[in-house]
Amino acid sequence: MDPRRAGRGAALCEEQGIALLPFAPLGRGFLTGRFSSFDDLPQDDFRRRLPRFQQDALRANLAIVGRVRQVAEPVGATPAQVALAWLLAEGRYVVPIPGTKTPKYLTDNAGAADVELSAADLAELDALPAPEGARY
């Protein structure tokens, strides 16, 4: 989930004491660093059929990941941790639910709680372009 899309929804949830649970906050793997091209996806991977993973959209979206990486490196975090920390910065009622297939991903995802993003980092992330291609 892109925190910019939460907008008033996150604030309204907090006002009402309702949790907001962003689904697929790591962009279905974009932010994990597991692939850098369409060909890296297994032949039977459902993402091969999703618009955001088609060749042109994939290139544009991986460029966005590169910009997230530029925020992550100076704070000693991974792009996935920065994405989760960005969501956590939206407030205590925002609880991202990332996929966690391996112990390594569990450790990486949990590490997001220790990532401190500055106001400048948050502004840089907020200025990123929206992902290319429809979500589904």
Residues covered by each model-derived region:
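Beta/alpha (TIM)-barrel catalytic core signal, keyed to glycine-rich beta->alpha loops juxtaposed to Asp/Glu
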Residues: 1-136
